[in-house]
């Protein structure tokens, strides 16, 4: 199991086929998601979804910063620490797909509705890609921090 940090976009105004130029009209604000993955399940099939759908995966929070509080979501420091050790440190300027593209692309295949949350993706440094891999273990603590938004801290607990 690994955790990766992403910035998340809560949607306020739904829509379909949203042009990139109008993305701001649809973003309520910004929050944090710890995109936890059970890599053993994820790699067992050609579809990654199963490894991301366990109970307690994808914790979100601890708050939502409204869109007017973040001038540019593409200029935010983002980091993940595991037991206090920095595992990922980057900036949202390094996203493969920017927020306007994500909203336009996703709304081209599905209707976005108020309350939907879009995760932006993660920077380099995920645990399973390290040499050697670094898996999450019971007792570990994962902290995800995004500049201007806050810090989300999650303990790793064995499934009962």
Give the predicted meaning of each segment:
Residues 3, 24-27, 96, 136:
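Short, conserved loop/turn and helix-capping segments at secondary-structure boundaries
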Residues 17-30:
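N-terminal accessory regions of nucleic-acid-interacting proteins
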Residues 12-16:
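Short, conserved beta-turn/loop elements at beta-strand boundaries and strand-helix junctions
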Residues 1-9:
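Short, small-residue-biased leader/transition segments that mark boundaries at the very start
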Residues 31, 37-160:
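Catalytic-pocket segment enriched in acidic/His residues
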Residues 8-11, 29-32, 64:
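Short hydrophobic-aromatic micro-motifs
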């Amino acid at each position: 199991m690994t955790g990766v940090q992403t910035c998340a976009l809560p949607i306020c105004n739904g829509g379909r086929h949203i042009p990139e130029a109008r993305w701001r009209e649809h973003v309520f604000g910004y929050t944090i998601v710890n995109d936890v993955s059970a890599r053993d399940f994820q790699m067992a099939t050609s579809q990654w979804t199963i490894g991301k759908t366990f109970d307690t995966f994808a914790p979100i929070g601890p708050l939502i910063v409204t869109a007017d509080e973040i001038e540019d979501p593409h200029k935010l420091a983002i980091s993940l620490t595991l037991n206090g050790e920095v595992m990922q440190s980057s900036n949202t300027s390094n996203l493969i797909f920017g927020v306007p593209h994500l909203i336009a692309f996703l709304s081209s295949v599905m209707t976005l509705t108020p309350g939907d949350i879009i995760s932006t993706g993660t920077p380099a440094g995920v645990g399973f890609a390290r040499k050697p891999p670094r898996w999450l273990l019971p007792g570990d603590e994962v902290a995800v921090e995004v500049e201007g938004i806050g810090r989300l801290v999650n303990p790793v607990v064995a499934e009962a």
